[in-house]
Amino acid sequence: MDKYLIKMPTKTNLNGDQKPAALKGTPKTIDKQKEKNTPTEKQKQEDDYVEKENTPKLRNAQIAKPASKRKNQDTPTEVKDIKNEEDGENPPKRRSARLTRSTRSMAEEGTPSPEKEKPEKLPFIKYKGAIKYYTENHEIAASADDVIQWIDKQTTLDVVPMAFDMEWPFSFQTGPGKSSVIQVCVDERCCYVYQLSKLKKLPAALVALLNHPKVRLHGVNIKADFRKLQRDFPEVSADPLIEKCVDLGVWCNEICETGGRWSLERLANFIAKKAMDKSKKVRMSKWHVIPLDENQLMYAAIDVYIGQVIYRDLEQREKVKLQNEANFKEQNGDAAFKAVKALGETFLDKITQVTI
């Protein structure tokens, strides 16, 4: 029977594994076929199959691939012809040899530096004068009376400038508090600080000092201070004080022909060439609490001291400007004066000749 059995070929699945064909026949023949399909024989068959596939010819055939042909690509000569045609239709624009303003300035002055100019460091104001500090009603009245007597003794002066400023507490919840401090300065060697926290009404001597006919009150945003003082102390009338006061920022714009709104700190930088320490810790401190500490007293004194310094400087500049304008008109006439004035001349410096 064995010689009539046909051995079926093995099948391979997609993974390359060989599956033996179904065994047919009697039990004896099936046992013989199982013995032939032992693991050793299977391993030999797989090794033979791998060796056949790894022959040099088969490897070269698998690796070698036909090179793809170039399609629809122009030859170098055709590309050059296309470029020449485009250049003929749209020739390249020639760069103008004329120098622009920016290139001319760079050529004359050199390439501008990318670094910004560092701001000038100014020295801080150091006040070494006296600070007279009063909190009681009678003390404030006596001090104001002493200042009035000193003003009356200045017989050679028609106007006595007096720096004026105020301080009050501020809260982001409740807003500005009641006027707490008034500081004045008529002489750079002494500043007066009056704390109003205990007062329900301003002393008559202090009101008389503010309304003295020879006193010219000055400060920055001083009109708003007078209006607030009137709201907090109705015995003070703001209108007469506003009429005779001088706002240093407005006066600076008139003399120096500048523009914009000024703060006391900026005026100190521009006019006096000094820096002010406007620390928020002191500026927003409790000005209504008695007594004031040293930092608060120095802050209040410096405000009116530097105000008096700025006033003196602007006063001197105004005199020089008026004198220069008069001399120029006398030498060159009104027409030349108007022409030069239209060009932005401030006449803060002396000008003797002009060419138009």
From Swiss-Prot:
Q: Which residues carry this modification: Phosphoserine?
A: S105, S113
Q: Which GO terms describe its cellular component?
A: nucleus
> What segment(s) does the record annotate as region Disordered?
1-120
Q: Tell me what this protein is called.
A: 3'-5' exonuclease
Could you tell me the superkingdom of the organism this chain comes from? Eukaryota
Q: Where does Mg(2+) 2 bind?
A: D165
CDD domains under this entry? WRN_exo
Q: What gene is this protein a product of?
A: WRNexo
Pfam families given for it?
A: DNA_pol_A_exo1
Q: Which UniProt keywords apply?
A: Exonuclease, Hydrolase, Magnesium, Metal-binding, Nuclease, Nucleus, Phosphoprotein
Q: Which organism is it from?
A: Drosophila willistoni (Fruit fly)
- Enumerate the residues binding Mg(2+) 1: D165, E167, D303
